[in-house]
C-alpha cells in the first residue's frame, strides 16, 4: 500500500482526522481521556476503551456532548478475548480502522528485591502483552482495508532513563513498548501502516495530590527537577499523539518521541 502526500496541500487539513475511525485504550482518564477527546474534536469516530466501564462511559458522554462521535467499551487489554471483543465492537460500529492508540497501562511502585513474580507478570501483561494484542488485532484490519493506518503507543521516558520514582518492572515493560514500536514499524510499513510512540515525561494525572491549584517549584520537587520547572498536562501528550496519528506525519514511522520538556537532557 502506497500512501502518498501532496506537495500542493499547504493547509492544516492533514492534522485533522475527518472521516477516520480510532480506538483508544486506557481512555477513561489521564492521557487516554485527553487523547480520545482530542481525536474526536478533529473529526475521528472514537471507540473509548477502559478497564473501568464507568470511566469509559463518562468520557464517551463528554465527547458526544461536545458534538463528537464515540462509543464506550470495557476492556482489559491483557485479556485476549476482551481485546478481540472490543475490536469486533468497533467493526460493527464504524467499519475500517484507521487509528489505534495504546495508552492502557499499569503503574505501581515495586521494590526490585521484594516484588513478587506475580507483580512482575501483571505489569508486563498490561503494558507489553496489552500493546501486542491490540496491534495484532489492528494490523489485519488496517491491511485488509487498503487504507493503511497509524498506531501510536504511549511509552515513557523511563524506557530510556529509569529514575528512582519508577520500578524495574515498569521501566522494562515500557522499554519493551519501544522495541515493539520499532519492530512493528519495520514489519508493517509494506501495508501503509505507521507505528510510532510517544514517551511522556512526568505528567499530571488522576490520583496526583490536590495542591489547591498551587504547584510546588522547589529544586527537590518533581516540577523543580524539570528544565521547564513544571510537569506536563495530559493534553500536551495527546497533541503529540494526534500529530503522529494524523496524515501530517505520513512519512514518520518507527520513532519514539519524548514529550518531557527536555527532561531526558537534564
Question: What would you call each of these model-derived segments?
Answer:
Residues 140, 186-187, 250:
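Alpha-helical segment proximal to the catalytic Tyr-Lys
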Residues 156:
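Residue(s) in the substrate-gating loop at a strand-loop-helix junction
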Residues 135, 173, 181:
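Active-site helix of classical SDR
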